[in-house]
Every structure is written in C-alpha cells, then in structure tokens.
Amino acid sequence: MMRILLFLATNLAVVLIASITLSLFGFNGFMAANGVDLNLSQLLVFCAVFGFAGSLFSLFISKWMAKMSTGTQIITQPRTRHEQWLLQTVEQLSREAGIKMPEVGIFPAYEANAFATGWNKNDALVAVSQGLLERFKEDEVRAVLAHEIGHVANGDMVTLALIQGVVNTFVMFFARIIGNFVDKVIFKNEEGQGMAYYIATIFAELVLGILASAIVMWFSRKREFRADDAGARLAGTGAMINALQRLRAEQGLPVHMPDTLNAFGINGGIKQGFARMFMSHPPLEERIDALRRRG
C-alpha cells in the first residue's frame, strides 16, 4: 500500500508540474486565442482521476480475472506428487524472497508458461501451465517459479499498473485538447462540442494509446530482466538459463495466455520489426545473454 501511496503522490506532483509548465509556456492563452476555452488544470485532474481509476481497478481484480481467463485451478489440498512439490517449492522461494506465501495454481495449457499477479506482494497468485509441469525438469520449473516470485517481490504488478495510470492520464488529456482544437479551430464550431470533437478525440485516443502502450511495454521488458535476476538469485543462474533455453526451444508453440497476463508470464512470444516495440518480454536470447554476463 505504501508503494501505491508514494507513486500516487509522485504522479500528482507530475500532474501539477505539467499544469504549471503549460501555463508558463502560454498554452492556455494560445488555445483561448484560437477560440478554445479550456481549463487545463481541471482537465488534467479529471483525466488523472479516470486514468488511474481504470488502472487500479484492473489491478485489484487481477487475481480473479486471471483465474477466470486461464481456467486456473488453485491448489488447496495437493492430490499428486507434482502438486505437493509445487506447493513446497513456492513456499520455500517465497520465504527466501521475504514475501507471504501466494496462492498457487495450475492452468490447462500445453505450452510451457507461468504467470504471477495480484495487487499486493503479500496477496498474490502464482500459476504454472500443465505443459510446464509435464515437460520441464524440476530445477527448470523451480527457476520459472523463482522468476515469478521475483515479479511479486519486486512489486511489478503494482508498478506497471501505476505506470499505465500515468499514460492513461496523458492520453486522455492530450486527446481532449486535440479534439477541442479540431472542433473549435478547424471546424469553427462555436456551440458546445460538435461531432468533430468526439471523432477527433476518439481517433487521438487510439493513436496516442498505441504510442503509450509502447512506453508501458518498454518498462515491462526492463522488469523482466529484474525478474530473471531474482530467479537466478533464488534458483541459481544455471537453472534460470536452462529454463529460458527450454522456453526458446518451444517458441514455435502457440501461446494461449491472455494478453493482460503476458507482462507477468515467463514467455511472452515473438514479434518482429516494428512490433518488437510492443513486446512485453525481451527476446529470450537477450535474457540469456544478460544472465550469462551476470555470472
């Protein structure tokens, strides 16, 4: 909770500074001179409220959504040796990472994958695919689990949700400025907000939203390297490298993980060219090289 409060305080300061900066550069005067009467400070606060509300709401329901979207079955009473080992391993890794034991689950998927989610590092969920348990060696599965525990211990779910809140705020803010400019300056509408405002605002939100998602994914890729480093500390560098090499060998298999969980999975798939900007994970080769340099 302290992380959320500190981050919100920081971003309120960012909103305030942005508002002051726009005023100092005469942006209000420029808009008014062109017939656009906007209170930028009020607009910025309005966008911040709605931008963060959606992001934080998604964070708070993330465990429930993950269970529903993947069909994850939570292990309460282990019925097999695999389930018993899984619970014991997660408990041990959590203790070493200094967090409370998360919920542990298995989701039905052939591809080797895993994810972690939850609004709080002491109220999280770690789940692995059936395919991962069946085909990977125990030390490789342990490394994957250590990677996911690393996400939880590092507070990555909260961090990315708050970063998403920031970009949501500015996407909404600038989209509405563009919408007003198009409506009042280009189409010369003087009676409220015309159709041009709504069309331009929606179009601007789509374009700016795509650009903003590249920023969020950049942060996500940086967090993956940190989670790999945590996995190497908890399970051993060799085991972490072996797990990533096994994942690389299976990259041809289709990924059935929902896009909303990809940022916190172990395997984010492959994209080429311009689409690489929107990858939630760095290429596996880069992650393996980073671990080798770690030694």
Swiss-Prot record:
The record's InterPro entries line, in alphabetical order, gives: HtpX_protease (IPR050083), Pept_M48_protease_HtpX (IPR022919), Peptidase_M48 (IPR001915)
Which coenzymes or cofactors are required? Zn(2+)
First-listed, main subcellular location of the protein, grouped into a coarse class:
membrane
Q: Look up keyword Plastid and say if it applies.
A: no
Q: Name the Gene Ontology molecular function terms of this record.
A: metalloendopeptidase activity; zinc ion binding
Q: How is the cofactor bound?
A: Binds 1 zinc ion per subunit.
**Residues annotated as binding Zn(2+):** H147, H151, E224
Task: Give the EC number(s) listed in the UniProt record.
Answer: 3.4.24.-
The residues responsible for catalysis, as annotated, are E148
Sorted alphabetically, the Gene Ontology BP terms of this entry are:
proteolysis
Q: Where in the cell is it found?
A: Cell inner membrane
Keyword Manganese: yes or no?
no
Q: What CDD domains does its record include?
A: M48B_HtpX_like (cd07335)
Membrane-spanning parts: 4-24, 41-61, 158-178, 199-219
Provide an example Pfam family for this protein: Peptidase_M48
Topological type in the membrane: Multi-pass membrane protein
Q: Which GO terms describe its cellular component?
A: plasma membrane
> What's in the keyword line of the UniProt record?
Cell inner membrane, Cell membrane, Hydrolase, Membrane, Metal-binding, Metalloprotease, Protease, Transmembrane, Transmembrane helix, Zinc
The UniProt entry's sequence similarity note says: Belongs to the peptidase M48B family.
Query: How is this protein named in the record?
Result: Protease HtpX
Q: Which source organism does the UniProt entry give? A: Pseudomonas fluorescens (strain Pf0-1)
Its encoding gene is what? htpX
